[in-house]
Amino acid sequence: MDKNKDLLENEQFLRIQKLNASDAGKRQSILVDNEDELYGLTSSNNSCASEHEGEGEGEDERPATTSSAPTQNHSAGDVAFIPGKTAEEDTETVTKVVESDDQVFRTHVQTLSSKGKSRYRKGSSNFISFFDDMAFENRPSILDGSVNDPFKTKFVGPTLEKEIRKREKELMAMRKNLHHGKPAPDADAADAPALTTTTTTTTSATSPETVVTIETTILSSNFSGLYVAFWMAIAFGAVKALIDYYYQHNGSFKDSEILKFMTTNLSTVALIDLIMYLSTFFVVGIQYLCKWGVLNWSSTGWAFTSIYELLFVGFYMYLTENILKLHWLSKIFLFLHSLVLLMKMHSFAFYNGYLWGIKQELQFSKSALAKYKDSVNDPDVVDALEKSCEFCSFELNSQSLNDQTQKFPNNINVSNFFMFTMFPTLIYQIEYPRTKEIRWVYVLEKICAIFGTIFLMMIDAQILMHPVAMRALDVRNSEWTGILDRLLKWAGLLVDIVPGFIVMYILDFYLIWDAILNCVAELTRFGDRYFYGDWWNCVSWADFSRIWNIPVHKFLLRHVYHSSMSSFKLNKSQATLMTFFLSSVVHELAMYVIFKRLRFYLFFFQMLQVPLVALTNTKYMKDRTVIGNVIFWLGICMGPSVMCTLYLTF
């Protein structure tokens, strides 16, 4: 009976019982930094908690969180009370400590008690992993799956004329039979893959009572030839522009400003980029210290990691601007790459931080269950411990299904983090879908696409954009003659730069999200090539923000959207606003790196997407998808040009 009382009055067990209550439906997580003092328990040296992750990961829309039950013992995970005291005295001591620290306890409860996650799907006993918000699988990119691969494997030339002639013969035979009152032969639609038919009904001329079905053919064709013609036109246009520039500048390219930008300080940029990459392994060191029991993730590990992440971006911004004084092109490259590395560090660190909490709770639940299972009469107590063990075991085991040697915490090693940094993804997990081999011909195609696209971008920037940018700087540095005059000049610059920016936007997207990411994915045998969706068909900015950049969207979904719901008790709308706000701040920082001017134009346009999303969800716009797509493309064509000229002119 004393053991029953010990367990039922143990604060740690009461937390786990609440987390796993079948009628509660949510798994609450409460952290107090000085839990050891509050509960009068000592923490195991070989475990780290993970309460600060709070990342939502699940298809459920409720906020997600980490939750852990610290291992309260000196050895083997057994529950240990204050030495030299009976169970009754120990309970009284815990009560007094809690009462004396009541204000601290309440503060932590108010901050963290909202962190919760449903462990079971509604109406079933199936677990919901904290990482159910996304899944990786073997799949090609959209351009490869819809255009490139079919063109290379299925293109046979013109087929429409052959199918039309076949259908014409069938139609003439059908009409002839109808004229003589004979039944129409069945047309095999499968024999006409290039044609789509609609069905109408008529009556026989000789037998009005007979209803006859006639199929009307709608033409459809393969446009692969136009795909070839498009790139052919781009290539000839680029060659012509290159030749014209060559002769206009006395047979030399040395005067090209864009070429100078691209080739200045290459060795310095490469060295800084290497140092920046190597410095990301700091988070691996933090996880090693947690693994060895030197640091506790919940109290110090997460704090060291978060501070380092802020210093990481700030330091390299300061280094490139104030010390090295690099050109704007070098600065924006290093800044954007630092953001990529920052997101990778954060995902690796807080993924493992969450699993430290799960592992700790499993240790506590197993030890408590082994000690009290036969002596506790309350079935709810045993049920809570068993559910905790089941869920934590499921969560840990489901992270590494194919390679047990990388099972947490064995995944915390330099080689594992190195491979993650090589993969074209910002979301860390222990295993990813992989292809069987590297297609070196495919790699060569993508390398050619990379350098070819960069070549086109340089020509576009040199001929269509750079002259307009220089005129914009002249306008900014000219004598102020009034806002109206400045706006008129700005409007003229805007009209001139729009065509070049449209081309640059499309080429930039293709270069990064298709050519580079697919090349890296092939070299690392990374199977999931879903780097972007069909954003060109978007009818709202909400769709665009989700599918134009899938890797970043996944990161924001897990580490910002769900995390803000858990940590700051935000609802879905507030979490969405929070995500847009953070994204807008980062985009504005990018503009500061380029223009060295803090004007908040891009921040304003980014946040403007929020009311635009609400507008597209209205009854008037929801069913007008064509208008929505036209408005979307108007924004894509005008938006970058408007922002660039605003930063340059004002």
Curated annotation (Swiss-Prot):
Keywords: Acyltransferase, Endoplasmic reticulum, Membrane, Transferase, Transmembrane, Transmembrane helix. It is a multi-pass membrane protein. It is found in: Endoplasmic reticulum membrane. The keyword Transferase applies. A motif (FYXDWWN motif) lies at residues 531-537. Belongs to the membrane-bound acyltransferase family. Sterol o-acyltransferase subfamily. This is Sterol O-acyltransferase 2. It comes from Saccharomyces uvarum (strain ATCC 76518 / CBS 7001 / CLIB 283 / NBRC 10550 / MCYC 623 / NCYC 2669 / NRRL Y-11845) (Yeast). The lineage of its organism: Eukaryota, Fungi, Dikarya, Ascomycota, Saccharomycotina.
